[in-house]
């Protein structure tokens, strides 16, 4: 059959023990016994496995959201440096993080990399280390007079401010760990020098205060909200009949496929299960 060159590859197989007559004929013509196959059911490898790229656990929530929009996906796999599956994050996880987390310390609790903040706020760091992490302090907006704000700013806080010299000076002297200057306002040399002496990071963003306040939570790394425990994942050799219940009894829509060593291969969905193509058999 393979000599027909029709683009398919055919493999001889048997479903049980060979009869003595069949064994004799195969031996007589120098043919190997066909491979024993006890189940010809459809497997995960027969499904349309979608090659959604894995992401690092330190990318921002905003970047993950944008990737979902670009890929038309609702779930992203999170992998380590060796491409082993570490977890997943869904579009619902991201939406929930926006709606339910109102704690002003959540940015620090998530150990947010400054490079995420710079990317999300379209910002430039003029004092500080872009590879550092914001891991202590609250986030607050300097909306009152400096004399009033001094009572609210604590050590290592992130202060969102404008172009007022006095507000920037007050934040640094009050122990702020970072000030975010909005509307692209220039920061004077004296403020930069003072910030450097106090170990205060200075970031300039072209965005307005309202937009910065909206986006700041989107800077957090996905690891803060990713799902690690109880992941439903499948192997390429799993039979589709055996995975149906697992796929149907959860709200998750997409499921990762990994090899035996845990390396990520791709994603499958319930829709892929319905469209899975069975093996073609010639009797």
Give the positions of each predicted feature.
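Short hydrophobic alpha-helical runs that function as membrane-insertion/retention elements
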Residues: 11, 34-36, 76-77, 158-161, ...
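Short, glycine/polar-rich helix-capping loops at beta-to-alpha or helix-loop-helix junctions
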Residues: 21-22, 186-193
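A glycine-centered beta-loop-beta connector
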Residues: 47, 68, 76-94, 247, ...
């Amino acid at each position: 059959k393979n000599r027909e060159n029709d683009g398919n590859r055919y493999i001889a197989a048997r479903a049980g023990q060979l009869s003595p007559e069949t064994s004799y004929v195969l031996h007589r013509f120098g043919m190997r016994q066909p491979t024993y196959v006890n189940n010809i059911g459809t497997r995960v490898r027969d499904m349309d496995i979608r090659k959604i790229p894995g992401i690092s656990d330190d990318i921002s929530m905003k970047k993950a959201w944008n990737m979902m929009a670009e890929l038309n996906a609702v779930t992203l796999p999170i992998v380590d440096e060796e491409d082993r599956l570490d977890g997943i994050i869904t579009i619902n996880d991201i939406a929930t993080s926006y709606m339910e987390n109102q704690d002003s310390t959540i940015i620090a609790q998530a150990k947010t990399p400054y490079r995420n903040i710079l990317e999300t706020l379209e910002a430039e760091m003029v004092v500080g280390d872009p590879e550092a992490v914001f891991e202590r302090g609250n986030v607050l907006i300097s909306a009152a007079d400096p004399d009033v704000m001094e009572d609210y700013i604590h050590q290592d806080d992130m202060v969102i401010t404008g172009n007022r010299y006095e507000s920037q000076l007050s934040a640094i002297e009050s122990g702020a760990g970072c000030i975010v200057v909005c509307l692209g306002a220039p920061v004077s040399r004296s403020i930069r020098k003072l910030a450097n002496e106090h170990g205060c990071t200075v970031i300039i963003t072209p965005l307005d205060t309202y937009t910065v306040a909206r986006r700041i939570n989107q800077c957090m790394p996905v690891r803060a909200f990713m799902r690690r425990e109880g992941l439903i994942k499948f192997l390429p050799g799993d039979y589709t009949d055996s995975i149906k219940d697992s796929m149907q009894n959860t709200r998750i829509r997409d499921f990762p496929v990994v090899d035996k060593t845990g390396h990520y291969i791709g994603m499958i969905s319930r829709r892929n299960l319905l469209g899975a193509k069975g093996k073609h058999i010639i009797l």
